[in-house]
């Protein structure tokens, strides 16, 4: 069955299930070679780089695994718009052209208007502006698109409704359906891309990864003019000391990445600084075609407005942007900061 899945001309969810299974684990090197060839065919030697910018750590949700959960006794910070300008300028000086703006769940201070204002400021400086915030209405997503937002990233965390309820004890994030349906609202509202993912470690990874595939496939069918990207975040240590009930090893994570590259050959796969330098070096160009670099997970972090707040999670790869780019070039890969000019945002 594994050989048939690897040789399939049009792999789908059945082949993905086989490639995610324990039976495929001994064929990891074969999967890696296939994933590398597919990545080279569809994405060349390019690895797109981005940087996250945390705008606010204020949150009223009770996610048991998150360093920003409302029951954490840590100082809360939120950047003023002037501080946002300073942080964006600091990122721009580092050479970044794609920024991901992050907040906690919706609250009175850091709500839609605040996110929109931050997007406008970022769009005046960067060619690509993504947001990883709270679920919004289709109309609100349309407002972000008009302000210059390119797309969203919104992890379902886990697709198992019962586990989701146990992991989100109170607050707006407890609404499973509102979060699940948000990427479709974003694409319907005019955003170009939707980034999906499940937080590996919360639930059975086999179930979550098959559900992630189904979610991505649905969006690709329904919103053919838009794009989908997939991330594979693993739980990292945070202030509350949460221990994942379903720990995922590096070897299993590699198997997941290779399986998705084989079964979704033209979908961008993303890997953040949650992972170690050694692992990220090995995955670059082998399934993964988009990576963060020089990341900070505290509010601010790049300029003079850097806060002393707790980070959302520990960064595992602390290399700066030049060092990370040097690694990519040493592997024969091309770090790319800019995919398109901001002037063409409304042209498609």
Per-segment meaning from a language model:
Residues 72-212, 218:
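Conserved Radical SAM active-site core
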Residues 35, 63, 101, 154, ...:
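Conserved, mostly hydrophobic/aromatic
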Residues 52-54, 104-106, 132-136, 157-159, ...:
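Active-site beta-loop-alpha junctions enriched in small/polar residues
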Residues 1-26, 92, 220-348:
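Auxiliary Fe-S-binding modules of radical SAM enzymes
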Residues 36-37, 120, 258:
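Active-site phosphate/pyrophosphate- and oxyanion-stabilizing loops and adjacent acidic/basic residues
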């Amino acid at each position: 069955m594994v050989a048939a899945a690897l040789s399939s001309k049009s792999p789908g969810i059945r082949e993905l299930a086989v490639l995610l299974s324990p039976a495929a684990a001994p064929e990891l090197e074969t999967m890696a070679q296939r994933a590398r060839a597919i990545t080279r065919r569809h994405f060349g030697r390019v690895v797109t780089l981005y940087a996250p910018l945390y705008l606010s750590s204020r949150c009223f949700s009770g996610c048991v695994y998150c360093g920003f959960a409302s029951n954490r006794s840590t100082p809360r910070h939120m950047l003023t718009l002037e501080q946002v300008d300073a942080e964006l300028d600091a990122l721009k000086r580092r050479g970044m052209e794609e920024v991901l703006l992050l907040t906690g769940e919706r609250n009175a201070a850091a709500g839609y208007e605040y996110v929109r204002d931050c997007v406008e400021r970022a769009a005046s400086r960067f060619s690509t502006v993504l947001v990883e915030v709270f679920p919004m209405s289709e109309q609100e997503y349309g407002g972000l698109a008009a302000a210059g937002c390119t797309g969203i990233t919104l992890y379902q965390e886990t697709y198992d409704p019962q586990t989701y309820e146990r992991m989100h004890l109170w607050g707006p994030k407890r609404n499973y359906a509102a979060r699940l349906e948000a990427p479709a609202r974003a694409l319907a509202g005019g955003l170009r891309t939707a980034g999906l993912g499940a937080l590996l470690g919360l639930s059975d990874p086999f179930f979550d990864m098959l559900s992630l595939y189904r979610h991505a496939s649905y969006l690709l069918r329904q919103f053919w003019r838009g794009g989908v990207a997939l991330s594979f975040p693993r739980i990292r240590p945070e202030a509350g000391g949460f221990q994942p009930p379903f720990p995922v090893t590096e070897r299993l994570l590699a198997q997941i990445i290779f399986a998705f590259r084989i079964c979704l050959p033209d979908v961008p796969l993303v890997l953040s600084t949650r992972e170690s330098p050694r692992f990220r070096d090995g995955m670059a160009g082998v399934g993964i075609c988009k990576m963060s670099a020089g990341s900070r997970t505290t509010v601010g972090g790049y300029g003079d407005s850097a806060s002393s707040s707790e980070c959302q999670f520990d960064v595992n790869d602390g290399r700066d942007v030049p060092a990370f780019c040097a690694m990519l070039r040493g592997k024969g890969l091309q770090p790319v900061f800019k995919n398109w000019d901001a002037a063409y945002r409304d042209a498609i």
